[in-house]
């Protein structure tokens, strides 16, 4: 039965346990015919990257995980001219370390970043194996999943109802590639529009203001309400340009735009005055 991995970026706290566990499992350990030892440095088969988003003081951090996607239509498999790459019955894509001849065609074929690495010392390509050697030994999950303290990593059978429910909430990385990956993400970063509302006459934060962003072109609307600090966050908006309207009963409406939300943006402090 095929395996899938779901990574929930919303609850990942950036502890790096998954990255460390991967190194601990593979550095200095020969798991042939699944994998030869990973080098001490230069390779991260589960690479954590801190994505700092927005502008001060409206900043969010997303901990992104780069890992082999174990695609059902993996471009690396036909690219290898010595047939060193194969897919197991459980869906894991493996580079046979004994058959690999170091031609690096798989590195060129892979459409994802920081997935396949080249080991100069061994003259072979290497990557995540879903810890297939552990699965064959009776483990139910790879080391990275076992090491995750928050439950951000979930691994299991693709037909398991609990896993299916997670996959239904998740999405693949770069879906336009249509390579049918077996790794899914919940909470992939999408743009936000943030700011703060205040009353300059009394130098106070404005709570309860309704902030509406309307996309230029298709008219799609996102709404939020300012909190006790006057802050508002319009999350997961479609990339594009927006007009932003701030309204509160008893106050003059304030409109701004176009706001470029092709990336996360802090529109700053918006002043409102009583009508």
What are the residue ranges of the model-derived segments?
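Short Pro-Gly-centered beta-turn/loop motif in secreted/extracellular proteins
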Residues: 206, 229-243, 249
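Flanking helices and flexible, charged tails adjoining ferredoxin-like Fe-S electron-transfer domains
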Residues: 30-67, 77, 99, 107-198
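Short, flexible loop/turn segments at beta-strand junctions in immunoglobulin-like
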Residues: 70, 99, 234-236
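A short, solvent-exposed loop/turn motif at the edges and junctions
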Residues: 245-257
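Short, acidic Ser/Thr/Gly-rich low-complexity loop/linker segments typical of extracellular
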Residues: 216-231
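Short, ordered, surface-exposed loop/turn motifs in non-cytosolic proteins
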Residues: 191-193, 200-217
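Extracellular beta-sheet/turn segments enriched in Thr/Pro/Gly and aliphatic residues
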Residues: 181-183, 260-275
């Amino acid at each position: 039965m095929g395996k899938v991995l779901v990574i929930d970026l919303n609850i990942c706290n950036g502890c790096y346990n998954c990255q460390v566990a991967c190194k601990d499992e593979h550095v200095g350990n020969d798991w042939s015919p699944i994998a030869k030892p990973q080098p001490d440095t230069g390779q991260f088969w589960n690479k954590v990257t801190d994505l700092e988003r927005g502008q001060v003081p409206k900043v969010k951090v997303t901990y992104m995980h780069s890992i082999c996607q174990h695609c059902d239509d993996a471009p690396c498999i036909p690219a290898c001219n010595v047939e060193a790459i194969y897919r197991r019955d459980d869906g894991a894509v493996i580079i046979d370390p004994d058959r690999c001849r170091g031609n690096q065609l798989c590195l060129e074929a892979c459409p994802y970043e920081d997935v396949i690495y080249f080991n100069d010392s061994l003259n072979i390509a290497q990557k995540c194996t879903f810890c297939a050697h552990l699965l064959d030994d009776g483990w139910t999950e790879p080391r990275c999943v076992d090491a995750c303290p928050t439950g951000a990593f979930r691994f299991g059978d693709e037909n398991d109802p609990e896993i299916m429910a997670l996959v239904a909430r998740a999405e693949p990385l770069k879906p336009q590639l249509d390579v049918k990956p077996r790794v899914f993400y919940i909470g992939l970063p999408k743009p936000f529009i943030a700011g703060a509302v205040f009353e300059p006459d009394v130098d106070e934060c404005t709570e309860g203001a309704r902030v509406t962003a309307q996309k230029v072109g298709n008219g799609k609307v996102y709404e939020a309400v300012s909190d006790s600090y006057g802050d508002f966050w319009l999350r997961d908006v479609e990339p594009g340009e927006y007009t932003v309207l701030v309204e509160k009963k008893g106050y003059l409406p304030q409109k701004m735009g176009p706001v470029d939300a092709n990336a996360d943006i802090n529109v700053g402090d918006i002043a409102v005055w009583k009508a």
